[in-house]
Amino acid sequence: VKAHELITSRTDHPLHVGITEAGTLFSGNIKSAVGLGIILYQGIGDTIRVSLTGDPLEEIKSAKRILKTLGLRKGGIEVVSCPTCGRTQIDLIGLANQVETLVQGYDLDIKVAVMGCVVNGPGEAKEADLGVAGGKGVGILIKKGEIVKKVPESELLSVLKDELDHWGK
């Protein structure tokens, strides 16, 4: 971070920023998000590079997500999910991972919430464009904070996919 701040104070040339040899997917993403977040928040940098020990495609996904989180990039669905708690009545971790995999095929600039119970899920998903929640065999689809459909829990993913396929049409 200090090196980027120093060079920016001494030149007007475009600057490529990154955290070199950040590490594995887990630790490298954390180091890159923190380091690049600080640098980019200060308005430093014209291009970025995330360096991870692993698949280069993961570097691209990470870079895009860092930019989107900072409000510097549009496009790509943001998935949010609640932490597991005593009210969780669904395989929330599994469902959230399935939703993250599903949304990679879409270039929509929306937020999708994955909630662990049908009681608090709709309220917690209010800021999302779409959301799913479930428990005790029942699933709900939430659109702009309103419950729009009840389905068997096993159909949540396919109902969400249908909504994404028709989003904005």
What are these model-derived regions, one by one?
Residues 22-23, 55, 87, 119-120, ...:
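Short, glycine-/Ser/Thr-/acidic-enriched flexible segments
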Residues 1-107:
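Catalytic alpha/beta core domains of metabolic enzymes, predominantly
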Residues 19-20, 42, 52, 85, ...:
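Fold-independent oxyanion-binding glycine-rich loops
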Residues 136-142, 146-168:
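Beta-strand/loop-dominated core regions that host nucleotide or nucleotide-derived cofactor-binding catalytic loops
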Residues 95-126:
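Hydrophobic alpha-helical bundle architecture
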Residues 18-30, 112-120, 134:
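Glycine-rich beta-to-alpha transition loops that act as phosphate-gripper elements at the mouths
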Residues 39, 82, 117, 125, ...:
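Conserved, mostly hydrophobic/aromatic
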